[in-house]
Amino acid sequence: MSFMGLPLAGQKHCPKSGQMEAMVMTCSLCHQDLPGMGSHLLSCQHLLRKDCFQGLIQELGQIAKAHETVADELISCPGCERVYLTRDVTEHFFLHCVPTEQPKMARNCSECKEKRAAHILCTYCNRWLCSSCTEEHRHSPVPGGPFFPRAQKGSPGVNGGPGDFTLYCPLHTQEVLKLFCETCDMLTCHSCLVVEHKEHRCRHVEEVLQNQRMLLEGVTTQVAHKKSSLQTSAKQIEDRIFEVKHQHRKVENQIKMAKMVLMNELNKQANGLIEELEGITNERKRKLEQQLQSIMVLNRQFEHVQNFINWAVCSKTSVPFLFSKELIVFQMQRLLETSCNTDPGSPWSIRFTWEPNFWTKQLASLGCITTEGGQMSRADAPAYGGLQGSSPFYQSHQSPVAQQEALSHPSHKFQSPAVCSSSVCCSHCSPVSPSLKGQVPPPSIHPAHSFRQPPEMVPQQLGSLQCSALLPREKELACSPHPPKLLQPWLETQPPVEQESTSQRLGQQLTSQPVCIVPPQDVQQGAHAQPTLQTPSIQVQFGHHQKLKLSHFQQQPQQQLPPPPPPLPHPPPPLPPPPQQPHPPLPPSQHLASSQHESPPGPACSQNMDIMHHKFELEEMQKDLELLLQAQQPSLQLSQTKSPQHLQQTIVGQINYIVRQPAPVQSQSQEETLQATDEPPASQGSKPALPLDKNTAAALPQASGEETPLSVPPVDSTIQHSSPNVVRKHSTSLSIMGFSNTLEMELSSTRLERPLEPQIQSVSNLTAGAPQAVPSLLSAPPKMVSSLTSVQNQAMPSLTTSHLQTVPSLVHSTFQSMPNLISDSPQAMASLASDHPQAGPSLMSGHTQAVPSLATCPLQSIPPVSDMQPETGSSSSSGRTSGSLCPRDGADPSLENALCKMESEDSTRFTDLLGQGPIVPGLDAPKDLAIPSELEEPINLSVKKPPLAPVVSTSTALQQYQNPKECENFEQGALELDAKENQSIRAFNSEHKIPYVRLERLKICAASSGEMPVFKLKPQKNDQDGSFLLIIECGTESSSMSIKVSQDRLSEATQAPGLEGRKVTVTSLAGQRPPEVEGTSPEEHRLIPRTPGAKKGPPAPIENEDFCAVCLNGGELLCCDRCPKVFHLSCHVPALLSFPGGEWVCTLCRSLTQPEMEYDCENACYNQPGMRASPGLSMYDQKKCEKLVLSLCCNNLSLPFHEPVSPLARHYYQIIKRPMDLSIIRRKLQKKDPAHYTTPEEVVSDVRLMFWNCAKFNYPDSEVAEAGRCLEVFFEGWLKEIYPEKRFAQPRQEDSDSEEVSSESGCSTPQGFPWPPYMQEGIQPKRRRRHMENERAKRMSFRLANSISQV
């Protein structure tokens, strides 16, 4: 440390000075604070505690004693590790000067007795003086000392601060060391001055201190200058480091660009070879296919004649045989004389030949790195590429003199085999050293190495000598261990006389080019060795003795020349080129190829080839995945309501379908995902929650013994009732949940445009039976919420929300427009409308089937849980109803019902749900109660099935009353539901269903007035007759209706264990009764809304969808007149040949027993009356199977199963031996197909095989496996509905593992040879793996467009 760093008495302590003081006050060895006394100061100005200093001395003494040496009194500083003599270590007196507290800023005068405040410091005597004492202060000689004035005498520190320090003389203990002897260079006192230093030069300590400070300031200034210069140097070095990093990145980019140039050239060459290979193989295959086709034609004629002769010989009629024997013999003779080329030719092989050793050696000598400037020595320049000690190579040829001259003045150049051929070969390469540009090569001493070309081609050749062209071509030749001949096969051979002039012209053109130096040892070696190069080529070998070398360009034959000595001026003239040149000239990228032998690659080459092979496979896999995504993009078009996360998971599922990777767990936040909340008993097995396509309105079927016939007259006379008026439809979203296996299946929300009528119809068309009509309730105001509830025994859900009220379902029930109403699986479709997403239960009916409509409204008057009184009963009423208002008894667990949920948006009219029934007065909805509802997510209901005692279930309705009395009144009367009981109910299971409610998010859209409708249910004045008043309030408008429950039917239903019907009677406030509907008994009454100004309205027409129900794409679509689905002609099953005229219904809506129309398809020609029935499915089974397959194709989850798995997925076909998909099934449904189905069991077997393959290949938690399970459950439900009387065997595992013996598309002869198809369309070209540049550009733009649209 320096004295300038010490704090002065009058200065404030800045933070920096405080840090320095902290450093000064710390021991360098133990890093502890120094005490006030006993510290030591080293020459390097590091400090040591007294104990630490003595410890170092003792340690040095022990070391010296151990080595039997004498300690030379040296000490090593622990801070800077410098060695000093121990005698140079002094005591740190500065610690005595350091004040223990902050020095005072105010000073007192040292002269006056009043101790006034001092203002001036006398620099001569270093005393503070006040203003008055300053005038009297003088410096005059005193008798006490001749060397210093009187004013400087006296005891110091009289007025000093606490930081003053006095040092006494060791000889005169009373004297203070205030003098400094410059002669002896030591402090002394006044007595010592008189005795020992009398003749010496002595000065006062303060004066000496001032002089020393001036000297130290000068030294400090020099140190500061030196420090600034060092900082400048450090900054320059940092800039150099940054420049080195920048140059590194720049050169690295240049190397990468060179790599890309090489890769592009290699890709072009490889593409050319592949094109050539395709041309060769296609021509060969075309000839063989023509030969095979002719053999097949002749074989069919032989079979026909042979079959006819066998039939004629075996027949009992001999006269026709004898009559036509001449014709038969003539035909046989003609066939025997027919000649056919059956010679397949000699064995044909094709292979790809190339020189891996040569190319890997050339790649190992790729480029070099040069530097300019600097003073880097040769030893400091590292060698790269394993060429240490070798001379740098330049791309040209020089004489040995030029080589020695170039080697004697080497530039700073790292070892590498090649350099770019021009000063700036491309925009990414750095320029070559200017010293290399001035070197002019003399004429080559090896004329064979010169370029043989006409003068007009010299500039073009020089222009092509760039880095991108030389790296894979001439540069490798110039850099090979033995300098080969630089062949130019694309040039004509010149006479030897012209070679020298050509070389001279070339040397003149290469004046501005960097020359290539070949080492002398390499030149000498090159004089005795002539390497043989072989470029990639394709050889087609016919037989064992024929070889044909094919290439895009003409190649010169290999020249076998003896190695000429170096002094020879000219080599022997080369052989003339072949006379025939059918191919274009060879570009510079080609060299002379050797067709005699192929040297095996070395270990390094094999390793490099393996790495290149793996990289190529990875790139191919990436391209295959991109092609797959591009090919499957049209099938992945989802609704705009889908989130990007859902789109990404869909694409990931498609990729996982190919590469067999487990997909991530589906997000729980998805609105389409419905999870099973409870597990079924162990006897049923665990079945996960499965989403189901919403386009299907089919429920899971029951057992065949669960049919419930209804004694209702047919409605053939009332089917055709249509209305010309167009009314906006109800957009609904339907989802299905089957209780038979405790599976919850929710419909995806991709298509929300679904009218209510086709959904009801599709639900009813799932079962087989005679057309029937179901009596039900007339619809209430369609703008209000309707909710159907399930029937459970001794189980009432907790309705804990006080601001919700469930409204009875008021649904119109004339199911007369449905031609096939089958009572196989009674179902209930119900939902609860609520403005709160977490409240409001909605229970399902065990035997009822109805179609509710959802709306949103604040519901009121929900009784507390304590007011809910469960009802027990032993009777069972299993009739079908259209609405239920109170849950009565437990649902029959044997009925295995399914819940259909619908969400309604922009609800308008709800009259005549099927659109074709008779018009009943009072069915229309008031316009003043319009409630648009946009419910994208319906309330999901599921059933928990604990093992309980079997209980007979009945149809009940939701209880909505304030006290038990109201509930009891309602149980005794209200709602006369007249429906015939199910006479074939099977034995009850040992389980009991307990309903529970799980609510999901509801998007509630308020009315135009901003208020939601309010529903209130109040008992009327006379509580004994069971009359209730339903009030609907929406803003300032209100409507009311009266509901009356009869008591006689209620008592019968609760007492009689037999199966009897219940009747519902609802009358209006005015006491009007609607006319009876044809086909119903007088006891069956309908619910009529009492609304002012209600008018009869026409039924709502069907609005069709905008996209095909199968492929989800647009275009020219065919609309069904009974459901909203639309189809392409080729997507429908069966595929149609033309657009029909007039009314048209799809396969899903067409009746199986009495089809409304016949399709114009290819199968129609086989169903002509006069044509013999072809072997295969019957017409009835054909329609059933087509309906099955179309239902699968219309399911959104079936998208991965529409087409076969891509052949790019190699592992799939290694695992799955018998692939199956819907396209194969649809093709085999066509009667023209040779593998046409003969029985429905074959169709079901193929469908189940498809699901089996999906489950076998994909991981269980992947999306495709989940979709396969959902689709399988959906298919089994349809199968039981369409074939309730059949039981199909499950596929065995060996069916999927074993390969098929015979071809699907071919016919097998008695000998077992699978002949290919007769027609030419059976020969399909293999899908190409390679794509051209424009196709890759299109794919890239398509992928970018898709990525932007998803963002």
From Swiss-Prot:
Residues 560-588 have a biased composition (Pro residues). A zinc finger (PHD-type) spans 1105-1152. Keywords: Bromodomain, Coiled coil, Metal-binding, Nucleus, Repeat, Zinc, Zinc-finger. Residues 664-676 have a biased composition (Polar residues). Residues 872-884 have a biased composition (Low complexity). The keyword Protein biosynthesis does not apply. Its main location: nucleus. Residues 542-608, 663-730, 857-895, 1067-1098, 1289-1351 are annotated as: Disordered. It is found in: Nucleus. A motif (PxVxL motif) lies at residues 995-999. The keyword Transcription regulation does not apply. Residues 1176-1282 form the Bromo domain. Disulfide bonds: none annotated. Zn(2+) 2 binds at C169, H172, C192, H197. Pfam families: Bromodomain (PF00439), PHD (PF00628), zf-B_box (PF00643), zf-B_box_Trim66 (PF25287). A zinc finger (B box-type) spans 105-150, 164-205. Residues 234-304 form a coiled coil. GO terms for molecular function: zinc ion binding. One of its GO terms (cellular component) is nucleus. Can form homodimers and heterodimers. Interacts with CBX5, CBX1 and CBX3 via PxVxL motif. May function as transcription repressor; The repressive effects are mediated, at least in part, by recruitment of deacetylase activity. May play a role as negative regulator of postmeiotic genes acting through CBX3 complex formation and centromere association. This is Tripartite motif-containing protein 66.
